[in-house]
Amino acid sequence: MRIILLGAPGAGKGTQAQFIMEKYGIPQISTGDMLRAAVKAGSELGLKAKEIMDAGKLVTDELVIALVKERITQDDCRDGFLLDGFPRTIPQADAMKEAGIKVDYVLEFDVPDDLIVERIVGRRVHAASGRVYHVKFNPPKVEDKDDVTGEDLTIRKDDQEATVRKRLVEYHQQTAPLVSYYRKEADAGNTQYFKLDGTRKVAEVSAELATILG
């Protein structure tokens, strides 16, 4: 079961990735984690990646694909894997295909931008414990105070509206074209494509995923 998750930041991919990993026992493959692990291990690919990153450059698609290929041969990927945040662009998707990495399911989480902004901008965090609240969907008992310690809650820099809207613009420019790319792949019989309404309750989306994935 090889799965790609698509959807804007804040569309609920992370929550559902957790559900899929726990239910089906497959690992989530993050290219960022892979790069860090390869650099730490000092593998040939890791040394190449380190050289590029130390020079302040972006790691090439070829190198990332090579890392993905290496990663999916490991034992924990025997029953499949989950890719979130990769591929981000059509050249990356093409490179994956050319490398012979087959994808069984592409799952798109669809949520309107304004709702994503509301979801993210309303987050409040208790930095010391990592507890997360939301002014509308999961408010603290006392406004802007942590329920347990009574300490102040803060807004993460990444959760500010201007930052969120900028990330959404980048997503629509760069990653959204993958939607039509993978729809065509599904039409050609190379994968299965499903679009999920991410505005629903978490449990409802999870139930639909369980039906799709079996």
Curated annotation (Swiss-Prot):
Instruction: State the superkingdom.
Output: Bacteria
Q: Which UniProt keywords apply?
A: ATP-binding, Cytoplasm, Kinase, Nucleotide biosynthesis, Nucleotide-binding, Transferase
Disulfide bridge positions per record: none
**Pfam families (alphabetical):** ADK, ADK_lid
Establish whether keyword Cell wall biogenesis/degradation is in the entry.
no
- For region NMP, the annotated ranges are 30-59
Query: Hey, which pathway is this one from?
Result: Purine metabolism; AMP biosynthesis via salvage pathway; AMP from ADP: step 1/1
Principal localization?
A: cytoplasm
Record bears the keyword Metal-binding: no
A cellular component term (GO) from this record?
A: cytoplasm
Q: What class of enzyme is it?
A: transferase
Q: Which residues does ATP bind?
A: 10-15, 123, 132-133, 200
Which positions does UniProt annotate for AMP binding?
Answer: 31, 36, 57-59, 85-88, 92, 156, 167
Task: Give the EC number.
Answer: 2.7.4.3
CDD domains under this entry?
Answer: ADK (cd01428)
Q: Name one GO biological process term.
A: AMP salvage
Checking Gene3D superfamilies in the record gives: P-loop containing nucleotide triphosphate hydrolases (3.40.50.300)
The segment annotated LID runs over 122-159
Any one GO molecular-function label of the UniProt entry: adenylate kinase activity
Instruction: Extract the InterPro entries matched here.
Output: Adenyl_kin_sub, Adenylat/UMP-CMP_kin, Adenylat_kinase_CS, Adenylate_kinase_lid-dom, P-loop_NTPase
Q: So what family is this one in?
A: Belongs to the adenylate kinase family.
Show the domain comment. Consists of three domains, a large central CORE domain and two small peripheral domains, NMPbind and LID, which undergo movements during catalysis. The LID domain closes over the site of phosphoryl transfer upon ATP binding. Assembling and dissambling the active center during each catalytic cycle provides an effective means to prevent ATP hydrolysis.
**Role, per record:** Catalyzes the reversible transfer of the terminal phosphate group between ATP and AMP. Plays an important role in cellular energy homeostasis and in adenine nucleotide metabolism.
Instruction: Show the NCBIfam families listed in the entry.
Output: adk (TIGR01351), PRK00279.1-1 (NF001379), PRK00279.1-2 (NF001380), PRK00279.1-3 (NF001381), PRK14527.1 (NF011100)
Subunit info here reads: Monomer.
Q: What is this protein called?
A: Adenylate kinase
